[in-house]
Amino acid sequence: MNRTVFFVSESTGITAETLGHSLLSQFDTIDFEQVYMPYINTDLRAKALTQRMQEAADRDGVRPIVFATMLNNEIREILESGNCYYVELFEGFVEPLSRELGVPPSRKSGRSHAITKPSYYTKRIEAINFAMANDDGIRPDNFHRADVVLIGVSRSGKTPTCLYLAMHYGLRSANYPVTEEDFERGDVPQLVWDCRHKLFALTIDPQRLQLIREERRPGSSYASLARCQDDIRMAAQIYKRLQIPVLNTTSQSIEEISSHIIKALRGSGEH
């Protein structure tokens, strides 16, 4: 079953996207066609969007879902009048919270990031830069500066997890790909061993890994099931030798994987 979903906001749309994704993740039997519509901040843009909603309804045979964070009543009414199932993610909470706090809301869009301390914002930017500069084992000599180091076979989810940890937690995250060279010697370089206390392994079911690799290199030996099975098996032997935590990414979201890592780091006193 296919369903079109619009993420709509007067500002960047990050809040609508984040909350909407959390809700949609509970319905994994449906394929969602996701459309991002930030800066819908005029009547004209809102009316144009209702036309797109109608087109989606005509195409899919069912009305689209709209996740929105609209504080402008006029624009919200235009969107609600469209052929859609409208989910307002702010308004149901703003008024009750206003009554509890005893002050009126500012009704300004794009304010969800304003409460973040500048120092934390800077930390996240630095962490993102670190993750990008230390992706795919480019600089193992920098691992000692990392808060966390992920290890895993190619396409096991290392890079997106590192970026998520950087963006949402401000963690300096690096990763190291386990390669044929490591398999041949049955071990990883000393620089990886040196950071074993902050090392996490990512594994994945061979069948799932094959599908992911097939998208990248169709018909290649790299994407064959036999190669995927061998890579996972030999990597598991290395993880056992290192005696590090192993997280299976097959059926877990990046958010779930990251939460496990954060919990482990806090339990160890690293963060």
Swiss-Prot record:
Keyword Nucleotide-binding: yes
InterPro entries given in the database record: Kinase-pyrophosphorylase, PSRP
Signal sequence annotation: none
EC number of the protein: 2.7.11.33, 2.7.4.28
Annotated residues for binding of ADP: 152-159
Reaction equations catalysed: [pyruvate, water dikinase] + ADP = [pyruvate, water dikinase]-phosphate + AMP + H(+); [pyruvate, water dikinase]-phosphate + phosphate + H(+) = [pyruvate, water dikinase] + diphosphate
Broad EC category: transferase
One MF annotation (Gene Ontology) recorded for this entry: ATP binding
Keyword Repressor: no
Source organism superkingdom: Bacteria
Entry keyword set: Kinase, Nucleotide-binding, Serine/threonine-protein kinase, Transferase
S-S bridge residues: none
Protein family according to the UniProt entry: Belongs to the pyruvate, phosphate/water dikinase regulatory protein family. PSRP subfamily.
Role of this protein: Bifunctional serine/threonine kinase and phosphorylase involved in the regulation of the phosphoenolpyruvate synthase (PEPS) by catalyzing its phosphorylation/dephosphorylation.
Protein name: Putative phosphoenolpyruvate synthase regulatory protein
Organism: Thiocapsa roseopersicina
